[in-house]
Curated annotation (Swiss-Prot):
The organism's place on the tree of life at top rank: Bacteria
Gene Ontology cellular component list: cytosolic large ribosomal subunit
Cited NCBIfam families: rplV_bact
BP terms from Gene Ontology: translation
PANTHER family named among the record's database cross-references: CHLOROPLAST 50S RIBOSOMAL PROTEIN L22-RELATED (PTHR13501), LARGE RIBOSOMAL SUBUNIT PROTEIN UL22M (PTHR13501:SF8)
Protein name per its UniProtKB record: Large ribosomal subunit protein uL22
Annotated HAMAP family: Ribosomal_uL22_B (MF_01331_B)
UniProt GO molecular function: rRNA binding; structural constituent of ribosome
Function: This protein binds specifically to 23S rRNA; its binding is stimulated by other ribosomal proteins, e.g. L4, L17, and L20. It is important during the early stages of 50S assembly. It makes multiple contacts with different domains of the 23S rRNA in the assembled 50S subunit and ribosome. The globular domain of the protein is located near the polypeptide exit tunnel on the outside of the subunit, while an extended beta-hairpin is found that lines the wall of the exit tunnel in the center of the 70S ribosome.
Gene of this entry: rplV
InterPro entries: Ribosomal_uL22, Ribosomal_uL22_bac/chlpt-type, Ribosomal_uL22_bac/org-type, Ribosomal_uL22_CS, Ribosomal_uL22_sf
Subunit structure: Part of the 50S ribosomal subunit.
Species the sequence originates in: Nitrosomonas europaea (strain ATCC 19718 / CIP 103999 / KCTC 2705 / NBRC 14298)
Amino acid sequence: METSAVLRSVRLSAQKGRLVADQIRGLQVERAIRLLTFSPKKGASIILKLLESAVANAEHNEGADIDELKISQIFIGQGATLKRVSPRAKGRGNRISKPTCNIFLTVSNK
């Protein structure tokens, strides 16, 4: 039994999100929650919310036991980049790119 959760257009770069995703891939859900709770990275709190959503989906839709769940798959893809302009001297402007990412998380009891 596999249950997934998806979070799109998160204001986080995919590169920084992958640092957190690599730490929890393949872990038991309980251990991953403990690791994410105390991680200082911005992506950890975002992935923690998504993980809790996936666990709730598994419990509600499939009737799964939370203690047996583990993270079978997590991957982070690059989303659309928001482009902004920062005003500079003498009428010029610099481009600022604000990257986003899409996070796909799957939990299973296997």
